[in-house]
């Protein structure tokens, strides 16, 4: 855990002063941060699964209920390789920005979850927030380097400010939101790695 936190902190600091940094390096740093996002969300999911009530599986909403499910995106890497760079970057940014409010909600509720690993879950959720807060401005710099439009984003509003009225509902909805984020973080990571590969002029089969 401490090694992961140190690595994330170093990557965050790398985005603080990036004037003059080339596109390849910016995308490399962004890809490393997005990889950490996905790894951390996977670790959090495993923590939750360690003590998750059987009834929670029944109560869990379907993936199609994720607030980002309406966004039309490539289904796999082969499809992503056919999408123009500026569109792929806009998709990654749209997904990332869509998680600002949901992650703030998760972070505010993690410490009160009815779960024996809530302290660990709380700590990792705050790390997720820190990662997001670093990656968002990092991608803004990528936008400027690529000469893309910074306004070409999809609106994916999140309307809830509660996880539920009872401890089981709160745990289930926390898990559901996290599973949605884990799925989206994988997409963000995949899109940024394709962009990094293209910027490095690699052949598609090498990406």
Swiss-Prot record:
Instruction: Cite the InterPro entries for this sequence.
Output: 4_helix_cytokine-like_core, Somatotropin/Prolactin, Somatotropin_CS
Tissue-by-tissue expression: Pituitary gland.
Disulfide bridges in this chain: 66-180, 197-207
> Which GO BP terms, alphabetically?
positive regulation of cell population proliferation; positive regulation of receptor signaling pathway via JAK-STAT; response to nutrient levels
Extract the signal peptide range. 1-20
Question: What cellular component GO annotations does this protein have?
Answer: extracellular space
What Pfam families does the record tag this protein with? Hormone_1
Which residue spans adopt a coiled-coil conformation according to this UniProt entry? none
Keywords, in A-Z order = Disulfide bond, Hormone, Secreted, Signal
Tell me where the transmembrane regions lie.
none
Q: Would the keyword Transferase be found if you checked this record's keyword annotation?
A: no
> Single GO molecular-function term?
hormone activity
The compartments listed are: Secreted
Which family would the database say this protein is a member of? Belongs to the somatotropin/prolactin family.
UniProt-recorded name of the protein: Prolactin
